[in-house]
Every structure is written in C-alpha cells, then in structure tokens.
Amino acid sequence: MKTNQQPKAVIVIFGATGDLAKRKLYPSIHRLYQNGQIGEEFAVVGVGRRPWSNEDLRQTVKTSISSSADKHIDDFTSHFYYHPFDVTNPGSYQELNVLLNQLEDTYQIPNNRMFYLAMAPEFFGTIAKTLKSEGVTATTGWSRLVIEKPFGHDLPSAQALNKEIREAFTEDQIYRIDHYLGKQMVQNIEVIRFANAIFEPLWTNRYISNIQITSSESLGVEDRARYYEKSGALRDMVQNHIMQMVALLAMEPPIKLNTEEIRSEKVKVLRALRPIAKDEVDEYFVRGQYHAGEIDGVPVPAYTDEDNVAPDSNTETFVAGKLLIDNFRWAGVPFYIRTGKRMKEKSTKIVVQFKDIPMNLYYGNENNMNPNLLVIHIQPDEGITLYLNAKKLGGAAHAQPIKLDYCSNCNDELNTPEAYEKLIHDCLLGDATNFAHWDEVALSWSFVDSISETWAANKTLSPNYESGSMGPKESDDLLVKDGLHWWNI
C-alpha cells in the first residue's frame, strides 16, 4: 500500500467555477499536496462554461486556499489548467481528451483519470455517457467518476440516473460522495464499536434503550433556496447523511475491514428498516418550517421570507423521525433522528442511551442519576463523552452523574483532515469504503419516498418552530409518548 500513497492522476472537475470547487475541492487538493499525499505527478483540469484562461483558474485557486501562508503556492497552482466546456457538445469532450493526453505526458501520469461532477445533477448522465462515447475514459490506466448529491430526487429518478451512468461506468468505477462519511468521528463509529470490549457486547437491544441522532444547523438556506425548495430537509439530509449514520451504528461486524464487506453489512441494515406506510407517517415522522427569530441575538427571517422562496412554500426545513430496525440485534430499539435549519446551534452528535439497571439501589430522593450515555460528537467538536454515575463526595452513599471526555480535535497541533480531503484521497487510491454503493442509495430512497409522497399530498405545513430553537414541539412529543426525551447535551 505504501508504494501507492502518492497516486498519479489527472483530476477533471466539472463545475470548476462553482462554489463547491472553491470552498471544498481546491483547499482539499492543496492540503493533500502540502502533506505529501500527492506528489508532482498530478494535474487538475477545471472545466466550465465561462471563457476563463489557465491564469484565471489559478488565481481562483490561490484565493480559495488563502495562499499567503504557502510559499510554494505557485508550484502547486502550476498543475491547474482550465478548459472552456459545453457538456452537450461532443467536440468539447474530444478537445478535453487531447488536453488530458498532453498533461499525462507532461506530468508522467499513467493514464489515470478522475472525473468529479461538481455541478447541476441534470447533466450527470449526459456527461458520463459522452465521456465514454468520445473515448475520454478509454485509457490504459483507471477512470473513476465522483458524483455529488443529490443522486436523484426519488427512487425512480435515481434508478434512471443510475442506468444512464452505468452505461458508461461500472459500479466499482462510481464514487457517490457523501461528505459525512469523510468525517473523522463518523469513521470512528466502527472503531468505537468493534475495537472496545466495553461496548461491543453491549451494542444490542438487551442493553441499549434508544439511539438519537441530531444534525442541527444555525444557518438558514442562504444561497441554496432554489435547490432547497425542490429538496427539503428529508431529501437533503435524511436520505443520505443520516441514513448512512444509522447504517454504521446498526450494522453487524464485517468479516473483514474492506469495502465489499462493510457495504454488505450496511445494506443489510437498510433492508431491515421497517417501512413507514403512508397512513403511519404522522405517527413516526414530524416536519417543520422555521419562522422568524434570533440566532445569537441577531434577528433572522422566516423561511418564507428568504430570497427565492415561495411565500406559500410547503418545504420542510426540519425533520424528526422514529426508525425501527426489524432484526435480531435491534428489535424494539428506536432510532430517533432530527435535522433542521435555523436551530439553536450547529451540531451533529449521536447519543446512545443504555438501559437502566433493574432495582438500582442508588435511585432515590437523594440521588440525581441519569442513565449511562455514550455521546459521539461529529461536529463542530469531534470526540466522545461517556456519562456514568459515581459516588458523591461525602459520607453518605449518594450517587451523581459524571462524564469522561475525549476530544480529538482540541489539540491545536493536530491537523485533522477535512472530509473532502480524505474522500478525494480515498478515490485516488481506489478505496470506495466511505462512498455510497447503489444498493444503499436505492434502499434509502425506497424508505423516504413514502414519507415525501405523503407530505407532498398534504400541503398544510406552516412555520411551526422559532428560529434559534431546537425544532417544533411535535418533535419532543415524538419521544415523550415513548417515555423518553431528546438529550440536548
């Protein structure tokens, strides 16, 4: 493996002038270069509709990575090239192929090509098919296709898109990116579970009461309103990011730590999810939309007052739900999920609540005890907190809650890789473990479609939670009726 730690490839970015490329892709490639994870045998070709030059792209790259801190920035950006492009014109692909061949000769790259689609999804199928038909993927090295979400709008559209792409690329060449799978603590879920004897035997319905996943954002829709109006929180967050976390939390131990075995176990979880019938949606799921309020003391508008949002919009900006997994390990254990915009804070965390001990001798009027909790902090802080009960200081045998903390990103000297940095490097190495397989995508869409169809038919949603809160009251009621509550810790 060490001989391949500096992969040699040309990275072609479709949508090179866009926001994702500037915010995430260019800084991530730069960090890989700085850290020696890619050497000098690489090139990046940015394609887009704008009539840019190589220098225009290089200046954009410098701006996006705060280049003043890197004295080698010109060496880095010299690897970047721009190619004006029309995705519907076969001639553009032929010209691109000529450029790629030239760059592979210049940088001694063995015909390895990574195509990153960071643009509007309606062009994904066209690009994939034309790359093949014009011979851009016909190389002696490898060709890989990286696809950003959304992968379809529902199961039928996802199936149609997958069929188009599979005409040009095989499944093992397709890397469907979910940046949550690149986050360090999401990847740490498997290690916490399978490398610790104090957790692995307890990770069942015998000892776990419930699992809660919260992914909250304090921002509103910002400049994504046009996309969000078609998507909503269910499609934007639940179908991909949250379903992936559920699968990692619930999967059986894989036979080996390789791509095929891990994906296989995740697929089994998604197959075991209890489907939500349309007449049960209101029992298991809650939706919300933010109205005006304050975030950190600053007034913010309601969703329907945001730019490019219809004043009578029925789009949900909040989702909470109860998921049940019908298998031997998890029967009877609810997985509660919630995600939303304009909430109290930006935070993603997982809370595993363990069951109480039968006839606990320390429950009583003098004791303020909580159940044992394992909290996995995904962002912005990355770490683990374990909540236990211990004896109070003093003579009486009274107990009190205590916590044990580990923070993985609190050390300023530790340069934690960004999610995109890790995923781009994984793709260059051919490691698809942290990318979504088609089976996972299809099963996730199959689960959420009945919910989205029910909500689409019932256009009664109105703003029902204040900006700066943790969501609508109905979200709390979802747990209260089960004798539980959200752990806001």
From Swiss-Prot:
Q: Which keywords does the record carry?
A: Carbohydrate metabolism, Glucose metabolism, NADP, Oxidoreductase
- Residues binding substrate are H179, K183, E217, D236, K341, K346
The organism's place on the tree of life at top rank:
Bacteria
Q: Where does NADP(+) bind?
A: G15, A16, T17, G18, D19, L20, A21, K22, R49, D86, V87, K149
Asked whether the keyword Oxidoreductase is assigned, the reply is yes
UniProt-listed PROSITE patterns:
G6P_DEHYDROGENASE (PS00069)
Q: Which InterPro entries match?
A: G6P_DH (IPR001282), G6P_DH_AS (IPR019796), G6P_DH_C (IPR022675), G6P_DH_NAD-bd (IPR022674), NAD(P)-bd_dom_sf (IPR036291)
Task: Return the GO cellular component terms, semicolon-separated.
Answer: cytosol
Q: Does NADP appear among the keywords? A: yes
Recorded catalytic activity of this chain's protein: D-glucose 6-phosphate + NADP(+) = 6-phospho-D-glucono-1,5-lactone + NADPH + H(+)
Q: Which principal EC class is assigned to this enzyme?
A: oxidoreductase
Q: Mind listing the GO molecular function terms for this protein?
A: glucose-6-phosphate dehydrogenase activity; NADP binding
Catalytic residues per the record?
Answer: H241 (proton acceptor)
Q: In which pathway does it act?
A: Carbohydrate degradation; pentose phosphate pathway; D-ribulose 5-phosphate from D-glucose 6-phosphate (oxidative stage): step 1/3
GO biological process: one example: glucose metabolic process
Q: What is its EC number?
A: 1.1.1.49
As for family, the record states: Belongs to the glucose-6-phosphate dehydrogenase family.
> What is the protein's given name?
Glucose-6-phosphate 1-dehydrogenase
Q: Which organism is it from?
A: Bacillus subtilis (strain 168)
